[in-house]
Amino acid sequence: MARFLLATQATPTISATDANPRTLGDSVSNNKNIASMDTHMVIILAALLCALICALGINSVLRCVLRCTRRFTPNEDPVDTNANVAKGIKKRALKVIPVDSYSPELKMKATECLICLGDFVEGETVRVLPKCNHGFHVKCIDTWLLSHSSCPTCRQSLLEHQTPANGSRRGDDVAT
């Protein structure tokens, strides 16, 4: 007699005449309930997926609208610190900042220019910023200050915000 590895025992089949009619009806109705529950679950998951996609779409549209409206609205505060840092200072204001000849006795916080990373050589002209006492090569710091109004090392603003008698604000004067 041959043996099969995955031999299964035959399950007795229930014929319609042997089975209780109530049991067959219950199993058919259970199958219908399970099928309708699966259908309802698929519909609910599809609705949730659609709601998520709609929410993400609305979020993207709102972010785009807010970004565009910020771009076109004028800045209400003319003395905004970020605007002043990006604005730079005028050439005539650069002349107010003192230029010295570098020597080891000069009271500067560093011995190299942090813009070009070059060491200071004795006798070289350097510009020392008045508020923070950081020193830089004249060409390096002048180029920087034409487009920025702060120290490149500590970001301290070099502009004085004075309110003249007429009430308008000026930010072109360099602190000395």
From Swiss-Prot:
Annotated Gene3D superfamilies: Zinc/RING finger domain, C3HC4 (zinc finger)
Pathway: Protein modification; protein ubiquitination
GO molecular function: ubiquitin-protein transferase activity; zinc ion binding
Record's bilayer topology term: Single-pass membrane protein
Keywords of the record: Membrane, Metal-binding, Signal, Transferase, Transmembrane, Transmembrane helix, Ubl conjugation pathway, Zinc, Zinc-finger
Domain free text: The RING-type zinc finger domain mediates binding to an E2 ubiquitin-conjugating enzyme.
Taxonomic path: Eukaryota, Viridiplantae, Streptophyta, Embryophyta, Tracheophyta
One Pfam family matching this protein: zf-RING_2
Protein name from the UniProt record: RING-H2 finger protein ATL73
Reaction catalysis annotation: S-ubiquitinyl-[E2 ubiquitin-conjugating enzyme]-L-cysteine + [acceptor protein]-L-lysine = [E2 ubiquitin-conjugating enzyme]-L-cysteine + N(6)-ubiquitinyl-[acceptor protein]-L-lysine
Signal sequence, renumbered to the chain: 1-16
Transmembrane segments: 42-62
Zinc-finger ranges (RING-type): 113-155
Similarity section: Belongs to the RING-type zinc finger family. ATL subfamily.
Organism: Arabidopsis thaliana
EC identifiers of the protein: 2.3.2.27
Compartments where located: Membrane
GO-annotated biological processes: anther dehiscence; pollen development; protein ubiquitination; regulation of jasmonic acid biosynthetic process; stamen development
First-level EC class: transferase
